[in-house]
């Protein structure tokens, strides 16, 4: 008696084949294509998710830089106004 966990030596499932050495039937080739397409679809779904996450992260960084640029430019205008007010208040000398 053989235990249930041990595969029988005559079992044909999960047998490794080399398509370059053995001639494959039409059904075997179709099955190989079907499995490869399923694996490809699974991988592309993962990759698409990663690409979306990366795109959103890059977009967030770009928008952050863009927003900070506007913020810093608006601060420069305030500093220019403060400098102009300081020039008006300082008495003029011959060196100015």
Swiss-Prot record:
- Give an example GO cellular component term for this record: mitochondrial inner membrane
List residues in topological domain: Mitochondrial matrix: 1-50
Top-level taxon of origin? Eukaryota
Q: Where in the cell is it found?
A: Mitochondrion inner membrane
Q: So where does this one cross the membrane?
A: 51-73
Provide the alphabetized UniProt keywords: Membrane, Mitochondrion, Mitochondrion inner membrane, Transmembrane, Transmembrane helix
Q: What Pfam families does its record include? A: Coa3_cc
Please provide the Gene Ontology terms (biological process) for this protein.
mitochondrial cytochrome c oxidase assembly; positive regulation of mitochondrial translation
Q: What's this protein's family per the entry? A: Belongs to the COA3 family.
**PANTHER family cross-referenced by the UniProt entry:** CYTOCHROME C OXIDASE ASSEMBLY FACTOR 3 HOMOLOG, MITOCHONDRIAL, CYTOCHROME C OXIDASE ASSEMBLY FACTOR 3, MITOCHONDRIAL
How does this protein assemble? Answer: Core component of the MITRAC (mitochondrial translation regulation assembly intermediate of cytochrome c oxidase complex) complex.
Q: What does this protein do?
A: Core component of the MITRAC (mitochondrial translation regulation assembly intermediate of cytochrome c oxidase complex) complex, that regulates cytochrome c oxidase assembly. MITRAC complexes regulate both translation of mitochondrial encoded components and assembly of nuclear-encoded components imported in mitochondrion. Required for efficient translation of MT-CO1 and mitochondrial respiratory chain complex IV assembly.
> What's the protein name?
Cytochrome c oxidase assembly factor 3 homolog, mitochondrial
Question: What organism, scientifically named, is this protein from?
Answer: Danio rerio (Zebrafish)
Q: What is the lineage of its organism?
A: Eukaryota, Metazoa, Chordata, Craniata, Vertebrata
The gene name on file is coa3a
